[in-house]
C-alpha cells in the first residue's frame, strides 16, 4: 500500500487533532456529574456508557494522521485499564493536557528530548509522593465507598465489598447476566471446575441430582482409566477404609466405567468419576493445582506411576466433594498450607510475566480456586442496553476495589494529583529545558480536577485556586459541591489507578513530543459509481 509522509509541526498537528477528537469525547464522562456517551453499533441496540476505554475503542477517525494520534491515546486508556481497571478517562485527560503544554514549548524552540526527560522526572517524583501518602484499606466500608464511586451506585458498592470480604484479595469476582431484575450475589465454596459426573448412576441425592462424597479419597490421573484391573487395584486400596472415592481422569471408559457403576449400585464402595477440566498443558496445570490442594499426587506416565501399582500415598483427601451433572466442587482439601502458598506464589509470578489477556484471566481463575474463592454478581435490568451498561460498570468497580486493597487509597476527585504535584514542585531541581518539562507536568496535573469541576457545572480555575488553599486531603466533593475532607467523606481513588493514569499519560506525551515524522497509509480513492443499466429505451 502507498504511504504518505508528514514532518515536524505538520505531522504533530495532524496527530494532535486526532488526540483532541478522542479526548474531548471521553472527558465529558469524568467525575460524579460526568455525562454518558452513546455508541452506535452496526447491529443490535446502541451502548450507553461512561467508561473511557469503551468509548475510546469505538472511535476510528477517517484522516490517517488523526487516526494515529487517536490510537496513541487509546493506548494510554488501554494500558491504564489493563493495570488498574479504572482511571482511563483521567489518563486520557492528563495525556491531552501534557501534549498541549508540551507542544507549545516545542513550537517555541525547546528541545523535545530534554522536555521528555523533565516530564519523566517530575512524574516519577509525583508517583513517589502518591505512594507515600497512600492510606491502606482497613475496613469493608472503605472498599464499599471506593466501589460506589467507580460504579456510581451504592448498592453495587455494598455487593462488591461483601464479595471481596468473603473471597479475599486473590479471589475472583465475576459479573453475569441475571434473568431477574436487580443484583444477586452467589459464592462458591472450595475449588470448583466445569466437569460433572460421567454417569448418572453415580448420583447419591435424587432430589437435586448430585453426588455428595463425605471425607473422600481423591485419585488424580492425567491419563484414561480403561481397564478392569486398574479399578480392582484402586478398589482394594479404598474399600478397607470404608471411605468414598473421587476419580478425576482424562476419561473413564472401556471395562472401567461399568465396573465402577456396578460396585456403586451394589454398595461395595461409593465412587464418582469425572473428566479432568481443560486441555493440554492447562489440564496438567489444573490437575497439579488439585493435587496440591488435596495432598494428592497426579498419577502419570511421565512420573513413572501406573494405576495398577500405586499405593494409597498418591491419594488426596477433602472434607467433602459435591458433583452435579455439569460441575464438581472440592471443599476443604487436605493439602499442606506451605505447598498451597508456594503454588499461589508461582501462579502470581506467571500472571505478572504473561502478556496475554486470556492467559492472565485463566491464571487468575486458578489462583482464586487455590487461594480465595469465587463470587458471582448477577445483574438484571429493565432493558438489555441498561443491563449491559450496568454490568460493565460493575466489572470496572470490582477491579477498582481490588486495586485499592493492593496499594491503598488517596483523596479522590483529582485532588491527590494536585497536592502531590505541589510537594514535588518544591523538591524537583532541574535546569534548562528539563525544568520546562517538569513545569509542563505541574501545569497539566490540574486537568482532571478542572474537568471534574466543569462537568459539575463549576469553574475549573476557581476550584483549583480554592483547593490549593485547603489542608492536605481536603478538596471538592463534586457530587455535593462541598469542600471537605475527602477521605472522611468516602471520596477516594486507589493509588494504583491514579499513578497508572499519570505514568501512562506521561509516557505517551513524551512519544508525542519527540515525533518528527509520521508515515501513514494513503487513503484509497473512492470506487467509481457503477454504471446505470440500459433500460431498453
From Swiss-Prot:
**Where does this protein reside within or beyond the cell?**
Cytoplasm
Catalytic reactions of this protein: ATP + H2O + a folded polypeptide = ADP + phosphate + an unfolded polypeptide
User: Cross-referenced PROSITE patterns, in alphabetical order?
Assistant: CHAPERONINS_CPN60 (PS00296)
| Annotated binding of ATP, by residue | 29-32, 86-90, 413, 477-479, 493
Kindly list the GO molecular function terms attached to this UniProt entry: ATP binding; ATP-dependent protein folding chaperone; isomerase activity; unfolded protein binding
Key word Isomerase present: yes
Q: Which top-rank group of organisms is this from?
A: Bacteria
Q: Which UniProt keywords apply?
A: ATP-binding, Chaperone, Cytoplasm, Isomerase, Nucleotide-binding
UniProt EC number: 5.6.1.7
The biological processes this protein is annotated with in GO are: protein refolding
By its UniProt entry, which InterPro entries does this protein fall under?
A: Chaperonin_Cpn60_CS, Cpn60/GroEL, Cpn60/GroEL/TCP-1, GroEL-like_apical_dom_sf, GROEL-like_equatorial_sf, TCP-1-like_intermed_sf
Which GO cellular component terms, listed alphabetically, does the Swiss-Prot or TrEMBL entry include?
cytoplasm
Q: What is its main location?
A: cytoplasm
Q: Which Pfam families match?
A: Cpn60_TCP1
Q: Which positions, given as ranges, span the membrane?
A: none
Chaperone found in the keyword field: yes
Enzyme kind, highest EC tier: isomerase
The record's annotation in HAMAP family points to: CH60
NCBIfam families with a match to the protein in the record: GroEL, PRK00013.1, PRK12849.1, PRK12850.1, PRK12851.1
Please describe the quaternary structure of this protein.
Answer: Forms a cylinder of 14 subunits composed of two heptameric rings stacked back-to-back. Interacts with the co-chaperonin GroES.
Query: In UniProt terms, what function does this protein have?
Result: Together with its co-chaperonin GroES, plays an essential role in assisting protein folding. The GroEL-GroES system forms a nano-cage that allows encapsulation of the non-native substrate proteins and provides a physical environment optimized to promote and accelerate protein folding.
Q: Which family does it belong to?
A: Belongs to the chaperonin (HSP60) family.
Q: What protein does this entry describe?
A: Chaperonin GroEL
Which species is listed as the source? Answer: Parascardovia denticolens (Bifidobacterium denticolens)
Its gene is: groEL
Amino acid at each position: 500500500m502507498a504511504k504518505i509522509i508528514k514532518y515536524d509541526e505538520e505531522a504533530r498537528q495532524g496527530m494532535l487533532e486526532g488526540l483532541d477528537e478522542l479526548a474531548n469525547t471521553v472527558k465529558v464522562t469524568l467525575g460524579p456529574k460526568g455525562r454518558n456517551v452513546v455508541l452506535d453499533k452496526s447491529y443490535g441496540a446502541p451502548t450507553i456508557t461512561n467508561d473511557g476505554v469503551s468509548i475510546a475503542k469505538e472511535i476510528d477517525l477517517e484522516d490517517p494522521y488523526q487516526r494515529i494520534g487517536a490510537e496513541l491515546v487509546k493506548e494510554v486508556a488501554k494500558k491504564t485499564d489493563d493495570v488498574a481497571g479504572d482511571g482511563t478517562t483521567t489518563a486520557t485527560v492528563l495525556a491531552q493536557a501534557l501534549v498541549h503544554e508540551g507542544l507549545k514549548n516545542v513550537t517555541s524552540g525547546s528541545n523535545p528530548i530534554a522536555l521528555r526527560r523533565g516530564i519523566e522526572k517530575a512524574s516519577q517524583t509525583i508517583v513517589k509522593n502518591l505512594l507515600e501518602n497512600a492510606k491502606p484499606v482497613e475496613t469493608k466500608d472503605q472498599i464499599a465507598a471506593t466501589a460506589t464511586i467507580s460504579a456510581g451506585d451504592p448498592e453495587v458498592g455494598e455487593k462488591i465489598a461483601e464479595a471481596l470480604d468473603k473471597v479475599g484479595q486473590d479471589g475472583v469476582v465475576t459479573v453475569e447476566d441475571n434473568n431477574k431484575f436487580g443484583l444477586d450475589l452467589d459464592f462458591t465454596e472450595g475449588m470448583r471446575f466445569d466437569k460433572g459426573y460421567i454417569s448418572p448412576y453415580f448420583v447419591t441425592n435424587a432430589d437435586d441430582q448430585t453426588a455428595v462424597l463425605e471425607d473422600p479419597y481423591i485419585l488424580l490421573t492425567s491419563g484414561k482409566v480403561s481397564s478392569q484391573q486398574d479399578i480392582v487395584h484402586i478398589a482394594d486400596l479404598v474399600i478397607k477404609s470404608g471411605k468414598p472415592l473421587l476419580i478425576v481422569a482424562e476419561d473413564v471408559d472401556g471395562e472401567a466405567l461399568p465396573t465402577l457403576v456396578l460396585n456403586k449400585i451394589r454398595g461395595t464402595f461409593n465412587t464418582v468419576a469425572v473428566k479432568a477440566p481443560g486441555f493440554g498443558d492447562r489440564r496438567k496445570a489444573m490437575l497439579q493445582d488439585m493435587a496440591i490442594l488435596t495432598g494428592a499426587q497426579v498419577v502419570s506416565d511421565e512420573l513413572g506411576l501406573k494405576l495398577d501399582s500405586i499405593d494409597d500415598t498418591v491419594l488426596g483427601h477433602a472434607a467433602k466433594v459435591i458433583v452435579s451433572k455439569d460441575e464438581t466442587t472440592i471443599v476443604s482439601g487436605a493439602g499442606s498450607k506451605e505447598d498451597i502458598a508456594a503454588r499461589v506464589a508461582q501462579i502470581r509470578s506467571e500472571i505478572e510475566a504473561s502478556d496475554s489477556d486470556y492467559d492472565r484471566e485463566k491464571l487468575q481463575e486458578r489462583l482464586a480456586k487455590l487461594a480465595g474463592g469465587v463470587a458471582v454478581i448477577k445483574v438484571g435490568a429493565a432493558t438489555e442496553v441498561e443491563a449491559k451498561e450496568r454490568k460493565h460498570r460493575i466489572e470496572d468497580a470490582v477491579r477498582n476495589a481490588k486495586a485499592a486493597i493492593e496499594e491503598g487509597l488517596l483523596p479522590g476527585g483529582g485532588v491527590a494529583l494536585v497536592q502531590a504535584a505541589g510537594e514535588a514542585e518544591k523538591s524537583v531541581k532541574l535546569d534548562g529545558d528539563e525544568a520546562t518539562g517538569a513545569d509542563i507536568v505541574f501545569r497539566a496535573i490540574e486537568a482532571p480536577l478542572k474537568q471534574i469541576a466543569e462537568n459539575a457545572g463549576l469553574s475549573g480555575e476557581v476550584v483549583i485556586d480554592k483547593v490549593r488553599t485547603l489542608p492536605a486531603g481536603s478538596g471538592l466533593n463534586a457530587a455535593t459541591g462541598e469542600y471537605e475532607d475527602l477521605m472522611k467523606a468516602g471520596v477516594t481513588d486507589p493509588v494504583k489507578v491514579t499513578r497508572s493514569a499519570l505514568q501512562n499519560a506521561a509516557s505517551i506525551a513524551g512519544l508525542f513530543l519527540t515525533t518528527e515524522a509520521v508515515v501513514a497509509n494513503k487513503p484509497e480513492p473512492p470506487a467509481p459509481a457503477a454504471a446505470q443499466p440500459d433500460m431498453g429505451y
